[in-house]
């Protein structure tokens, strides 16, 4: 048993022309959770049951998890411990949906902080309007044995521009789809929970992509500890920039039922059957103004921010549940072994072979490409049958 103390740190007050507090720490002003091991009596000798949580290096901001060559960065191993009590949370979605912002909040930031203080730097409004993206491949941030993975946007025009093109200067749609499937399939395999972040409650293009990506799996039969082949990844859908109608309980229930129907026959993906656990509706966070730190928030603004932070805290607690073990044996996988598994997935020949066959099928015209995205479900059953 461990004693958990929640320590809340208040922001220092500014007086006169005092400068703002330093923003070196991204979690400044956010709740901090310190897990302390129960003290052992002096006359009791240490036993195998006395567990000391491994220490973890503090990160100030997210770093690249995957390099431009698709390999895992070597420095990541120094950030992980041998603790088996860890949680991997990923976020996918289109450009500008709020993936980086949401992960930053879950990692410890709060709604009153400036964007430059977020551990995952979000795309600026100007860059988003110009269809430019911020995250490249996958970024990672680790805190309190929580591993957060932020994926580059799906179907981003700026990403497609950097991909190989066919003759005539036209976009190679099959390559773009293959790149999206590669990252999505990887995150589905190595994550406990994947957050599907979108401005719409039901993005069919994303759902179709998920149904195809779940079938693109590596073959890691000789990996040790032995992996659980029937493990399911938990999906949580996040509706961002919600309007008043989106917040109605009856509307949320109806939309959750639609999402459950979309994954009722899934073998490796699951959604919660409890109400208000499948679809989380969040209102937009406006850009924080500098004077809010010094003059205080307006009453309505403060109430809205407090409500948002409480909702994030509830989601953070909920994400600790419904975690299925990666391995057959309970708690056999620790953080460092998880990283070894990630490397094996990246290098797995079966996964790459499936992706190449899928890309070849798309190039030959088996797949259908729509102007507003990619339709992935109808022909997937033909391809994988």
From Swiss-Prot:
Leader sequence segment:
none
GO BP term (any one): nuclear-transcribed mRNA catabolic process, nonsense-mediated decay
Identify the keywords attached in UniProt to this record, alphabetized.
Answer: Nonsense-mediated mRNA decay
Which molecular-function annotation in GO is an example for this chain? Answer: molecular sequestering activity
Q: Where is this region: Disordered?
A: 1-32
| Xref: SUPFAM superfamilies | P-loop containing nucleoside triphosphate hydrolases
**Phenotype of null mutants:** Defects in nonsense-mediated decay (NMD).
State if Phosphoprotein is listed as a keyword.
no
Q: Which protein family is named in the record?
A: Belongs to the SMG9 family.
Q: What does this protein do?
A: Involved in nonsense-mediated decay (NMD) of mRNAs containing premature stop codons. Probable component of kinase complex containing smg-1 and recruited to stalled ribosomes.
**Protein's recorded name:** Nonsense-mediated mRNA decay factor SMG9
Give the source lineage, highest ranks first: Eukaryota, Metazoa, Ecdysozoa, Nematoda, Chromadorea
